[in-house]
Curated annotation (Swiss-Prot):
Gene Ontology CC annotation, any one: membrane
Spans annotated as Disordered: 155-177
Species per Swiss-Prot/TrEMBL record: Homo sapiens
Entry keyword set: Membrane, Signal, Transmembrane, Transmembrane helix
Signal sequence, renumbered to the chain: 1-23
Localization terms from the record: Membrane
InterPro entries from the UniProt entry: TEX50
Domain of life: Eukaryota
Membrane topology field: Single-pass type I membrane protein
Protein name per its UniProtKB record: Testis-expressed protein 50
Main localisation: membrane
Length: 177
């Protein structure tokens, strides 16, 4: 039960102790300066009043709450710097991506230009591709020819068994008569 009340107590103490220390606009100037200075003596000390006399109460209170908050200013400065860093990183990544994409496009254009332009030399990629295709066709044809020759000279074992069975059945049929 006390563990549930503890955050509530700390938050109330925080509000009580630090609530008034962040605002300098709440009262008259002489209450914030000290009890020794009277309101009549303020113009002798050249102390300026709060700049937000014409604002409505809520805006005046809001301006007073955020007027001297170093934490708030520090957070805004930190957020500003973080946003700058994030936008810088995004800019660098975008430039890198566009650079890579441009280089890839340039390589593709060079490759297309080399394929479209007929090469007189024997080292062009188009001639190498045709040579490779012809070599594959020739090797495939030679392998198929070897298999065909092997099959024609050596009948398969199924054919031999089938032929033997036919001969046996003919011999048995001849013996019956």
């Amino acid at each position: 039960m006390s563990n549930q009340r503890l955050p509530l107590i700390f938050s109330l103490l925080f509000i009580c102790f630090f609530g008034e220390s962040f605002c300098i606009c709440d009262g008259t100037v002489w209450t914030k300066v000290g009890w020794e200075i009277l309101p009549e003596e303020v113009h002798y000390w050249k102390v300026k009043g709060s700049p937000s006399h014409c604002l409505p109460y809520l805006l005046d209170k809001l301006c007073c709450d955020f007027a001297n908050m170093d934490i708030f200013q520090g957070c805004l400065y930190l957020i500003y710097n973080l946003l700058q860093a994030v936008f810088f990183v995004l800019f660098v990544l975008s430039v890198h991506y566009l650079w890579k994409k441009w280089k890839k496009h340039q390589k593709k254009l060079k490759k297309q230009a080399s394929l479209e332009k007929p090469g007189n030399d024997l080292e062009s990629p188009l001639i190498n591709n045709i040579d490779q295709t012809l070599h594959r066709v020739a090797t495939t044809a030679s392998v198929i020819y070897k298999i065909w020759e092997h099959r024609s000279h050596h009948p398969s074992s199924k054919k031999i068994k089938h032929c033997k069975l036919k001969k046996k059945s003919k011999e048995e049929g001849a013996r019956r008569y």
